């Protein structure tokens, strides 16, 4: 969001924006809230919780006096939380810590085995988000996740049918209107359009060498490629996907494009592309793997040990 407006607001500036717009978008590091961490470590000790992960998140929520909080826990290969079981345990820890801090917490365990939307990198993500808000782009998984999480928060605040309400707010243009109001209050250009957001001039597009379906995406590799291209420090750098898991892929179709602001960084990213398994393309996976119709002949004597 730093592409659209200043987000390194001080506490007084944040209060001013909230009082004016009933919302804000800030970088927590600019508020100097970390000293509260010590108190949370003492609270967490009897819960046997990681003394770093939870306080780093919850301390800042308590410091700004949040009373309702929705936490997104992306889950799956390529994420910090690999299984739904682990995600549920983490969610319970967050909720218990929230109870002790008088913050009502709910968690959304979300699918994390591919990027949300098609963009990785500050300008690319801002371009995509603004396009969706304006109704100019169709990004189903981004809309689905955003309205799911917004819907949970709406229901926590007493509204009914939260997801449907969130979708209506998005489709009606009210979400875009509020975003532009916040952009203006925080010193950005409220008239900004997606095409006004500069992207890196240096690009490289990876194309498929065969036809099939996109079966998997290596999130960690994509993030590393975006980082080598210059993101997030270089706002115009990053990766834009052209295909998502399950999409049909034909030979020579574009799979993703790397953006960089400097050619030397693009070259580094391209080297990593060549070294990595970024995407998996093949035939659509079937549920039946293999039929076993006859008792297999053992290769050695079967012995039951007690």
Protein language model features and the residues they cover:
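Well-ordered secondary-structure scaffolds
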Residues: 48-53, 60-306
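Phosphate/pyrophosphate-binding betaalpha-module
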Residues: 2-64
């Amino acid at each position: 969001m730093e592409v659209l407006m200043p987000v390194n607001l001080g506490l007084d500036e944040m209060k001013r924006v909230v009082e004016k717009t009933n919302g804000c978008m800030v970088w927590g590091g600019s508020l100097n809230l970390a000293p509260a961490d010590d108190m949370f470590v003492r609270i967490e000790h009897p819960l046997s919780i990681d003394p770093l992960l939870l306080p780093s998140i919850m301390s800042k929520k308590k410091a700004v006096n949040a009373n309702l909080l929705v936490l997104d826990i992306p889950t799956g290969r390529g994420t910090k939380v690999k299984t739904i079981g682990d995600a549920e345990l983490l969610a319970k820890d967050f909720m218990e810590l929230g109870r002790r801090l008088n913050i009502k917490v709910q968690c959304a365990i979300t699918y994390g085995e591919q990027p949300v939307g098609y963009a990785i990198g500050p300008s690319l993500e801002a371009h995509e988000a603004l396009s969706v808000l304006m109704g100019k782009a169709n990004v189903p998984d981004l809309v689905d996740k955003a309205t799911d999480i917004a819907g949970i928060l709406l229901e926590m605040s007493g509204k009914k049918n939260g997801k449907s309400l969130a979708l209506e707010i998005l489709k009606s243009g009210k979400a875009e209107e509020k975003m532009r109001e916040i952009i203006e209050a925080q010193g950005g250009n409220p008239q900004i359009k997606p095409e006004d957001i500069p992207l890196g001039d240096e690009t490289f597009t990876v194309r498929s060498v065969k036809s099939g379906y996109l079966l998997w995406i290596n999130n960690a590799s994509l993030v590393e490629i975006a980082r080598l291209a210059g993101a997030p420090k270089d706002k115009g750098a990053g990766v834009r996907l052209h295909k998502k898991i399950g999409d049909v892929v034909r030979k020579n179709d574009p799979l993703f494009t790397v953006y960089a602001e400097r050619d030397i960084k693009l070259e580094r990213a391209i080297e990593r592309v060549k070294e990595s398994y970024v995407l998996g393309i093949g035939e659509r996976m079937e549920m039946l793997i293999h039929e076993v119709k006859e008792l297999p002949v053992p290769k050695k004597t079967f012995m039951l040990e007690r």
